[in-house]
Curated annotation (Swiss-Prot):
Belongs to the UPF0301 (AlgH) family. NCBIfam families: PRK00228.1-1 (NF001266), PRK00228.1-4 (NF001268). PANTHER family: UNCHARACTERIZED PROTEIN YQGE, UPF0301 PROTEIN YQGE. This is UPF0301 protein RHE_CH00966. It comes from the Bacteria. Pfam families: DUF179. GO terms for cellular component: cytosol. Gene3D superfamilies: VC0467-like.
Amino acid sequence: MSLSTLKNRRERGFFDGQFLIAMPGMEDRNFARTVIYICAHSDAGAMGFVINRPQSLTFTDVLLHLDMIKQEEPIVLPQRARDFPIQTGGPVESGRGFVLHSDDYASDSSIPVSDDICLTATLDIVRAISKGAGPKRATMLLGYSSWAAGQLENEVANNGWLTCPANEELIFDRNLDDKYERALAGMGINAAMLSAEAGHA
């Protein structure tokens, strides 16, 4: 599923607004120990973002790359902009930036993905954030994760993923180190026990 499909969807699918939590046996290194927020799911496939993978780039790096600031300017950015989190959202279009954010900010290009969360993938939100404005809660993700028609359903059926309702606090939490464990804990599952059980399956 692509961003254009997300824009044109008419109804929400079964996995919309769900977390996917990778099982210990996940063989794809792109998704090992990941938590993914599913933004859209339909008969055409699914699209979402990894929310617990750091990115080496900073928001200042992004602004420099987009020529929004000059090399000598980063220090004048508002503190909120300098601290703005950048994460790896997935292996598809990994050079493209997407901003998941609270619904207090909206532009003509913003796409609602839940009652409280929107997705914007245009420069207007980057400019707003660089000025210390923009949404109260947000994170930028480079790339996204995508599944073809029926692919995600098959992976879940084959025990590749656990699923649970998404938690907005976890989506925007900047502490990435233990998000995987906390997502599992939210389901009442101990990550260490899950790994041990998978190893003896």
